[in-house]
Amino acid sequence: MLDILVYLYESFRMAELAPDRDALEKRLFAAGFEEAHINATLDWFANLTSSAAHDRLAYAQYRHYAPEELESLNDACREEISYLVGAEILDPESREWVISGLMALAGEDIEPDHVRWMTLIVLWSRGLIEHFTHLEEMLLNHEPGRLH
């Protein structure tokens, strides 16, 4: 899933509009992605992008992780998420979408780089990335605790 999301981000981050779903499916299939992964990813992404139009929900600033989240997200990943919230890069709602995306990576070993990519994808898809100058460079090239 993350490979497909990164591909979409890299292909369409500068575009005003991405192609429709059918065109995306064909393009992703031609790029070598499996149909089941394409459909699951595009379904998750459609939910994410449709939520951007809704009123922001009130989420708690601090989060307690469910047992399955604790199992999937190691200490480094949870610290990265906490750091991004503390640095005001992720608001609580975006944090929930990042966690949702990470949990959808079922079976993968999730690392802090996955958290950073998912953060970029969530902020980009929700139209929030423009609020942060050089966010892509900062997120992908920082050492924990050195993002300023």
From Swiss-Prot:
Pfam families: DUF494. Transmembrane segments: none annotated. Belongs to the Smg family. This is Protein Smg homolog. The gene is smg.
